[in-house]
Amino acid sequence: MLFFEPSVRNTENCTARFTAKDGDASLGVCELLLHDRLADITAVSLQTEDLSIGEGLLRAALNFASNRGYYMAVFSAKDAEKVRARLPFEEKNGRLQGDIPSLLAGTCGNIDKS
């Protein structure tokens, strides 16, 4: 069974890390930094081609932030475009951002299935 395991770090570069696990196997990791009233997705890496695992990691991180009173999110992770595209982040002022309720809303099949 797939589980998105949170690990609170509270360091300068990472507030929480989420690991996608299937039993003992790690399928991916997402790092979140809460700062300046923003939930910042700073890193995403997958050990699988299944982009839905990455989407689940993003949703777990954004839900974590929302439960702590954060409303806006930015995506600063490098080399994670395919995963980022699973949620409707928009480019504004040179960065990818969105309000968490909109990012967590359903996609109604508008996901690139590649």
Q: Which residues make up each language-model segment?
A:
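Short, exposed beta-strand/loop patches in secreted or surface proteins that constitute
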Residues: E31-L33, A73, P88-F89
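Conserved acetyl-CoA-binding loop-helix of GNAT-fold acetyltransferases
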Residues: E49-S66
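Short amphipathic alpha-helix that is part of the acyltransferase structural core
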Residues: M1-K21, G106-S114
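Conserved donor-binding loop and adjoining core beta-sheet/short helix segment
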Residues: A16-I53
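Conserved active-site alpha-helix within GNAT-family acetyltransferase domains
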Residues: K78-R95
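C-terminal "cap" of GNAT-fold acetyltransferases
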Residues: K92-S114
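Conserved GNAT acetyl-CoA-binding A-motif
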Residues: A65-K78
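Sterically constrained small-residue positions within well-ordered secondary structures
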Residues: R9-T11, G23, L32-H35, F64-S66
